[in-house]
A protein has these predicted regions:
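C-terminal-most transmembrane helix of multi-pass membrane proteins
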Residues: 2-18, 145, 243, 279-335
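Transmembrane alpha-helices of multi-pass small-molecule transport proteins
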Residues: 2-13, 27, 52-102, 129-133, ...
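Glycine-/small-residue-enriched transmembrane alpha-helix faces in small-molecule transporters
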Residues: 2-60, 168-200, 224, 288, ...
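Helix-helix packing/entry segments at the starts of transmembrane helices
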Residues: 35-36, 58-61, 100, 117-125, ...
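Specific transmembrane alpha-helical segments of multi-pass solute transporters/efflux pumps
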Residues: 38-45, 77-117, 122-123, 159, ...
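Hydrophobic/aromatic residues within transmembrane alpha-helices
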Residues: 49, 58, 62, 110, ...
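C-terminal transmembrane-helix exit sites in multi-pass transporters
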Residues: 69-77, 126-151, 283-307
């Protein structure tokens, strides 16, 4: 076997052709992590709604608000959308129906079994799935040092999430129910595919168009799911105080702003690196739970959580630096 530099693919050429801000591009891996941190900010606002609204009803309202905000963008980007092609449209449709709509519902449903440790430990399969899909779909190849470094990131997240009882996942997997595990695994697979397919679609369209399509195409899917679950009566439970400020805040911060930042950064970040940076989400969610009410649940903060957070941040910074400094990736070919 010998290693030869591979000529840029059509996909890579399209990505390179897109204009970007050099400062943003330089810190793209870090910005993916910032976007993932913003996703976790919805915990405070969502807690004010779960008393009388289901997860599906909350997601439908959030998606409808963001779609309303982005409709002018979608109208102005019709020329941009013509660059997608059949495979691009399939990718965007799968993101909207899978990563945006179905994955959130599956992940939330997995908690209904009361086996939280099993849900979180299976969620850690998301980076592995995304890295595998990036290898298959995008042809991404990582150098040998990437794998132990990624393992450190996974271990760091484990330290944060299971600081109180490191053996909790073992007990949960022994006593857990298959249904809860399958739901969590399904959500992880859909979110992982969303990262890879999003990176693929961004080779043809702008991050504004990608964000607009994700929410707009997901809305009818979510409406159908809500109708199947609750019927027309499911849309009568909303109150004005739900929208201002809670649903509006969810739509703007972890919804609109976070996804715009995420896709802008993802357009300059390999999917296999982005999926590691996305692990800032469970870490942030766990740390928010340590905040005093009403922001969090006043859970104790452990030294291992601080260490784990530092390790994950170090890995993300290293990946961001290596993305800029490393020479072009090569692929192994037959001698």
């Amino acid at each position: 076997m010998s290693e030869k530099a591979v000529a840029p693919s059509r996909y890579a050429t399209r990505v390179a052709a897109q204009a970007g801000n050099p400062r943003v591009d330089r810190f793209s891996v870090l910005l993916v992590a910032v976007a993932a941190t913003l996703w976790a900010s919805d915990a405070y606002f969502r807690n004010q709604l779960i008393g009388h609204l289901s997860p599906t009803q909350i997601v439908v309202a959030e998606d409808a608000l963001v779609t309303l905000f982005l409709l002018p963008v979608l109208v102005r980007s019709w020329r941009d959308l013509s660059h997608l092609g059949p495979r691009g449209w399939v990718a965007v449709a799968l993101i909207a129906a899978g990563a945006q709509a179905l994955a959130t519902i599956l992940f939330t449903a997995s908690f209904s079994y009361g086996i939280y440790a099993e849900t979180f430990v299976l969620q850690q399969t998301q980076p592995l799935i995304a890295i595998g899909l990036a290898w298959i779909v995008l042809g991404e190849r990582r150098r040998p040092w990437f794998w132990p470094t990624a393992a450190v990131a996974v271990a760091a997240v484990y330290m944060v999430v299971f600081a109180q009882d490191p053996l909790a996942p073992i007990s949960a997997l022994q006593k857990g129910r298959l249904e809860a595990g399958l739901l969590a695994l399904g959500a992880a697979a859909l979110w992982a595919s969303g990262t890879v397919l999003g990176r693929f679609a961004l080779g043809s369209i702008s991050f504004w168009s990608m964000t607009s399509l994700r929410f707009t195409l997901a809305l009818p899917v979510l409406v159908v799911i809500a109708l199947m679950q609750y019927g027309p009566a499911g849309f009568t439970h909303y109150r004005f105080t739900d929208f201002v400020p809670n649903l509006l805040a969810i739509a703007i911060v972890p919804g609109l702003l976070a996804l715009l930042l995420y896709y802008r950064a993802l357009s300059r970040t390999p999917a296999s690196l982005a999926t590691i940076a996305e692990m800032a989400f469970p870490v942030t969610a766990t740390l928010i739970a340590s905040a005093p009410p009403p922001w969090g649940f006043n859970q104790p903060l452990y030294a291992t959580q601080i260490i784990g957070t530092g390790l994950l941040l170090g890995v993300i910074v290293l990946f961001n630096w290596s993305k800029e400094k490393a020479p072009p990736v090569v692929q192994a070919t037959a001698a």
